[in-house]
């Protein structure tokens, strides 16, 4: 289930890094998660088998679990309501019928721990997205509280850029920015407390929000998956290290060490790295949902 292998009777209206969207009508669309993998904003040639199915199951778990915090993109329809049976059978585990929403023009990132681009910013300025942090934090330090650190939404192929909350207010308006920040932190806080009981630390995550036709803020796209988040194992976590994560980190680390310049095309990823990645995605699903 890679770029070109799927043909549906619905019209494809968008192809993203991982997900493809198909038009159902003016209120609904079909979102299909492929097995494509992107790293450093480049889509790799090598798919990760079953990744789309695992991601969809993790997302659906969280959408349901967090539905009391805010509305989400579910319509209540099944793929069998909108596709012929033979097509629905093919994609039932990797597709969702969702509301057509107007996406909000920022990436809504919440961080509970210090790593990644946040760590780089902190080392240079002592801040992330303009937020002052305590001194002497190290890689993987737990932050005193979860922080909202938005970034700009760039086109596929360009890197998103961390922005301050004031810039976020300029982009989407102060009322909406306040709502997004409050909901993003509430979602992260509840999810991270639950995940901890299952042996997973959610280091940071990216939420996607949209507005419905009434202007209601709605959670959309994917939620708290190993693609949109960094998951660490409680067992291997140690501040001052770069804890291994339940996601494409195997691939990212391999690419980092390959000498690749992070421009397309990416080098071919070895089979054992791909298998380790599949196993990690599956482990995250099993831990969270069992």
UniProtKB/Swiss-Prot annotation:
UniProt keyword list: ATP-binding, Ligase, Nucleotide-binding, Purine biosynthesis
One Gene Ontology biological process: 'de novo' IMP biosynthetic process
Alphabetized InterPro entries for the sequence: SAICAR_synt/ADE2_N, SAICAR_synth, SAICAR_synthetase_CS
Gene Ontology terms, MF aspect: ATP binding; phosphoribosylaminoimidazolesuccinocarboxamide synthase activity
Pathway the protein takes part in: Purine metabolism; IMP biosynthesis via de novo pathway; 5-amino-1-(5-phospho-D-ribosyl)imidazole-4-carboxamide from 5-amino-1-(5-phospho-D-ribosyl)imidazole-4-carboxylate: step 1/2
Top enzyme class: ligase
Pfam families, per database record: SAICAR_synt
Superkingdom assignment: Bacteria
Listed GO CC annotations: cytoplasm
UniProt xrefs under PANTHER family: PHOSPHORIBOSYLAMINOIMIDAZOLE-SUCCINOCARBOXAMIDE SYNTHASE
Protein name: Phosphoribosylaminoimidazole-succinocarboxamide synthase
Lineage: Bacteria, Pseudomonadati, Pseudomonadota, Gammaproteobacteria, Pasteurellales
